[in-house]
Amino acid sequence: MKNNSVLNNNFIDLNLKSTNREGVLEELTDILYENKIIDDKDGFLKDVYIREYAGSTGVGNHIALPHGKSKYVRKASVVVGRTNCEIEWGSVDGLPVSFFILFAVPEYGDVGIEGKIISSICIKLADDDICRLLLDAKSNEEVFDILYDNN
């Protein structure tokens, strides 16, 4: 199994069942909770929604980067999901979203190398070709390799 300090294959689900924003965020949060990254699902989700209401996290190219800085996060982590349908997210390019990268960041403390990895993911998503590769990925390993190539 491929892994690093913020993501492993258990944190990637390319078959999310949800058809709306709330469902996607709940499914991704469940992954964090099941892997003991967060202590409280409802508390973390509340913090994610606070950020969502502040402005859209749809960055374009059918990708959204919801995130929460929360006291319920034990360790900075990333969880990735993809739906088979497109979901309206209020993205900057007006396109619906089907690929999601949820960042979970502790409210306090230094995120160190985890913060650098998260930052490098955001930089990669400025590349349209990288976005297309993620949307077309066939496996968790492929997603991992795309996100962490040269990290």
Where are these regions (language model features)?
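Cytosolic covalent-transfer regions centered on His/Cys nucleophiles
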Residues: 1-151
